[in-house]
């Protein structure tokens, strides 16, 4: 196995993009809230799923855009410099690089995230909820 962004590092595994992935089922099976897992990779981007509830930390990604796709539930994205956006099932929103944001889920939400492989979970902010890329790969 190669260590390119389109294949998992040695000793880790995620879904083969050539095989269908049920994103909602993969997210629902996650044991922990706010702990995304990589399910596929394409063109240097990771496709991640997560199960979330409550408020996440304020953070930004200085060099990367981040796309949120709600699979089940309703997710609010709070911003410091613009009105909040609320997403329902099947809706997505791309948070531009450098924009501070905070995802909020009043009830459990299943979501998919699309972002460059190098994107750090909470940007430069480190909390007990921060997951490394290796952890997101299941290492």
Regions found by a protein language model. Name each.
Residues 10, 14-27, 40, 106-139:
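Double-stranded beta-helix
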Residues 51-52, 61-80, 114:
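Short, conserved beta-strand element in jelly-roll/cupin
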Residues 81-97:
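Short acidic-glycine-tyrosine-enriched beta hairpin
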Residues 46, 55, 67, 74-76, ...:
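Structural motif
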Residues 59-60, 102-103:
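Short glycine/serine/proline-enriched coil/turn segments at secondary-structure junctions
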Residues 1-10:
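Actinobacteria-biased recognition of intrinsically disordered, low-complexity terminal regions
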Residues 23-58, 64:
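A short glycine-rich, His/Asp/Glu-containing loop-to-beta-strand
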Residues 43, 71-72, 88-89, 107:
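A cytosolic small-molecule/anion-sensing beta-strand core signal
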